[in-house]
Amino acid sequence: MDDTIKKELQSAVFERLIQHLRERKDVQNLDLMNLAGFCRNCLSKWYREEAQKNGIEISDPDARKHVYGMPYNEWKKKFQK
């Protein structure tokens, strides 16, 4: 498998994970952190850091919006227990 295909597959898997977490609003970040060692906020931080490595500036709120599918404060009000 060449690197381009590998990167495309990895990107698709990441987006699928993000979509899965958007659909599973019942799963709290604290539960994810306790069980898996990462949460939605970690994913948004990693997304922002990888963008920075490529010379792309993404704000923390924009990175979180990508992961949560809505502004973070809105998600917290609606779904955080």
Question: What residue spans do the PLM features occupy?
Answer:
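Domain-level signature for proteins that mediate thiol-based redox and metal-cofactor handling
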Residues: 1-81
